[in-house]
Amino acid sequence: MAAAGDEIETLIATMARLPGLGPRSARRIVLHLIRRRTGQMAQLAGLMANVAEHARECLVCGNVTGSDICPICEDPDRATGEICVVTDVADLWALERGRAFHGRYHVLGGSLSALDEVGPEDLRIPQLIARIAEEGITEVILALSATVEGQTTAHYIAEALAPTGVAVTGLAQGVPIGGELDYLDDGTITAALRARRKL
C-alpha cells in the first residue's frame, strides 16, 4: 500500500528516474513542492509545460532553445571563424559557464560507439562539414570528452575535415583521461580551452 497515495507515489517514482536523483532525494523534493504547492509547485508545473511545448534544437548548432535559432547563433558579437564541437548540450552549457570561448558551437548529439551502434550517420557530422563551407570557418575546436568514444569521434572528424584545409584543434591539459566535460569545474575548462592543440 502506498503511504502517500498513488498520484504522489507515481510522482516520486518518476522524479527518482531523473539523473542524479534517487528515491530518497525524489521523496524530499516532492514533499518540499507539496508544502509549497501554491507557489513553487504551480510555477514549476507551468514552466515545465511551457518548456515541453516550446523547446527544440537550434537549426544551426543543435543547442536547446525556445526558438528556431538559439541566442548564441544569433549573437553578432560572437567570433564567426571558430566552431567548438561538443558531444551534447550539457557540454555546451559547461563551456559557456567557463566564459573562455566566445565563438559558435556545434552539438554532435552523441559520440561514435560500436558497442551502442552509433555511426557517423547518426551524428550531426554532415551538418558540421556544411557549416564549415557556408560560414567560412577557419578553426574547428573539438571539445570532446577524453573517453574512448570521444577520442574516436575526434579522430574521425579530424580525418573528415582534412580535405577542407580548416585547422582542427582539440582540448589539451586539464581534461582528465576518461573525464566528462559536464563534470569539470570552470577553471579546468578555461585552462583546457586556452591550451588546445592541433590534431
From Swiss-Prot:
Toprim domain segment(s): 81-176
Zinc finger (C4-type): 58-73
Highest taxon listed in the record's lineage: Bacteria
SUPFAM superfamilies for this protein: Recombination protein RecR
GO molecular function, one term: DNA binding
Biological process annotations from GO: DNA recombination; DNA repair
Function according to Swiss-Prot or TrEMBL: May play a role in DNA repair. It seems to be involved in an RecBC-independent recombinational process of DNA repair. It may act with RecF and RecO.
Name the record gives this protein: Recombination protein RecR
Taxonomic lineage from the root: Bacteria, Pseudomonadati, Pseudomonadota, Alphaproteobacteria, Rhodobacterales
Gene: recR
